[in-house]
Amino acid sequence: MKIYNTLTKAKEEFIPLQEGKVSMYVCGPTVYNYIHIGNARPVVVFDTVRRYLEYKGYDVNFVSNFTDVDDKIIKKANEEGVSAHEISERYIKEYLKDTEALNVLPVTTRPKATEEIDGMIDMIEELIEKGHAYEKNGTVYFKTRSFKQYGKLSKKNIDDLEAGARIAVADEKDDPMDFVLWKPKKVGEPAWSAPWCDGRPGWHIECSVMSKKYLGDQIDIHAGGEDLIFPHHENEIAQTECCTGKEFAKYWMHNGFLNVDNKKMSKSEGNFFTVREIFAEYAPAVLRFFLLSVNYRSPINFSRDIIESSKNGLERIQTAVEQLHFLAKVKAEKGELSTELTESESTLLKEFDALIKKFEDAMDDDFNTADAISSIFEMVKLSNTYVTVESSVEMIQKVLSNITTFCDILGLETEKKAEILDEEIEQLIADRQSARKAKDFAKSDEIRNLLLEKGIILEDTREGVKWKRA
C-alpha cells in the first residue's frame, strides 16, 4: 500500500512505526458555526482512510481535536452575548450530528483544546528552556530560526517568508517569522493562569500537545486540508520536533480544496453551503458519495449537476442491493437453500474476484476512492446482468456480500432510508416539543437525530417547527 507523502512529495510504501498498529491525527474543526461542505471533505476522506486501514487489519488509534477557544469563537460569543464555552459546546454538538449523518465513525479520542491547557503550558516552558522560545511582555514566541529544518513540509524558504513578513512585524518580536505560543488576555476573553501572564494558547501549540499526549512523540499519519500545510502543520513540526528531537509524523496527508461551480466558495459569491443546507435537499449519503467521487488530493467541484449525478450513482448501487435482498428472500420463501454453485456461477465469481482485486489495488494506491467506486459499479453491472431468481443462494449471497463490504469500506450506505409517514413525523415532532418543555434536551436531540436518520430535516423557527424531506 502506498501513500502520497506531502513531506517528500512522492508516493511511499506504507510501513507503520509499530507493526499492525497505526497512529493517526487529523486536525479537527474550530467550533463556531455549522460546518460547510468544504469542511466535510477532510472528515469524510480521512474517515475512509481509517476504514480501509482497519479493513487491512490495522489497529487504528485515530485522534481528532476540537479547537474550542479561538478569535472566531470569541467574536461569535460577543455578538450573541454568551460565553465562548456556550458557543463551542453548541457547535460541537451540531458537528457531531452532521458527521454522524455522514456516516463518519467515532474517533478513538476527541480532545478539546481548553481541557489540555496545562499540557500546552508545559510544552511552552520546555521550548523556552531548550532555547526555542522566548517571552516578551507576557507573549511567548517560538524562535523559528532555531529549527533548522523550518519549511521542510511546505518547501518554503524562511528568508523569502521573512521578506513578506517584515511589513506587519510586531516591534517586540526578535524575528518577523517568530509566531505566538501564548498570548495575554484581553477584556471579555477567556483566560488561563500561566507563568508569563493570564492568557490563552496560540493555535499551533494546541495540536502539538494533543497529538503528543494521545499518540506519543512520533505518529504514523498526520492529516488535514491542504490549507493547513502552511503555517499550521509547518509550525506543528517545528514545535514538536524541537521538544522531542524526533521526527514528528512519518506520513503527511492533505486533501484538496472544494470549489462551487468552479469558483472558490464564499458568502460574498452567494455559493456558500453548509452541510445542513445540502441535507435539506439530498440524503447525507449522497454528499458522502460526492466527496469520495474524486481523488482526495485533487480539487473537487460542487454543482447541482454533479450532486444529482452522485445521487443517481448511489441509487444505482442501492437498487442493486435491494434487488439482491429480494432475490435472497424469494429463495428462502421457496425453501431453495442449496449452497452449490453452477459452473457458470463459479466462472462469474472469478470476475467478481478480479473486481475485488481492482478495488483493493485502487485503495492501495493512495486511497483512490474514485477508481474504487468504479469497481463497485462494475460489480453492480455484473449483478444486474447475471444474478437472477434462477441463481443459487450461494451466488446471491456472495455477490451481495461483495458489494456491501466494499461500500461499507467507503462508508456508503447500501440501504435506502425507509419512508416515514407524515403522521409519524408530526407525532415525533410533538414528542420532541414536549421533551424540550420538560428540559429533557437529551430526549429532544435523540428524536431530532432519529428524524435526520430517516431523511427528515427539522428547522426551529419563531412560527414553530418546520420540516422537510431530504
Curated annotation (Swiss-Prot):
Gene name as annotated: cysS
InterPro entries registered for this protein in UniProt: Cys-tRNA-ligase (IPR015803), Cys-tRNA-synt_Ia_DALR (IPR015273), Cys-tRNA/MSH_ligase (IPR024909), CysS_C (IPR056411), Rossmann-like_a/b/a_fold (IPR014729), tRNA-synt_1_cat_dom (IPR032678), tRNAsynth_Ia_anticodon-bd (IPR009080)
UniProt key word Acyltransferase: no
This enzyme's EC code(s): 6.1.1.16
PANTHER family according to UniProt: CYSTEINE--TRNA LIGASE, CYTOPLASMIC (PTHR10890:SF3), CYSTEINYL-TRNA SYNTHETASE (PTHR10890)
Subunit and partners: Monomer.
GO biological-process terms attached to the record: cysteinyl-tRNA aminoacylation
Family, similarity comment: Belongs to the class-I aminoacyl-tRNA synthetase family.
One of the record's GO cellular component terms: cytosol
Keyword Cell cycle attributed: no
Keywords noted in UniProt: Aminoacyl-tRNA synthetase, ATP-binding, Cytoplasm, Ligase, Metal-binding, Nucleotide-binding, Protein biosynthesis, Zinc
Native species: Lachnoclostridium phytofermentans (strain ATCC 700394 / DSM 18823 / ISDg)
Cofactor, free-text remark: Binds 1 zinc ion per subunit.
Cofactor(s) needed: Zn(2+)
Segments carrying motif 'KMSKS' region: 264-268
Residues annotated as binding Zn(2+): 27, 207, 232, 236
Catalytic activity of the protein: tRNA(Cys) + L-cysteine + ATP = L-cysteinyl-tRNA(Cys) + AMP + diphosphate
Binding site for ATP: 267
Record-linked SMART domains: DALR_2
Record's protein name: Cysteine--tRNA ligase
A Pfam family: DALR_2
Subcellular location: Cytoplasm
Domain of life: Bacteria
Motif 'HIGH' region positions after renumbering to this chain: 29-39
Signal sequence bounds: none
NCBIfam families registered for this protein in UniProt: cysS (TIGR00435)
Entry GO MF terms: ATP binding; cysteine-tRNA ligase activity; zinc ion binding
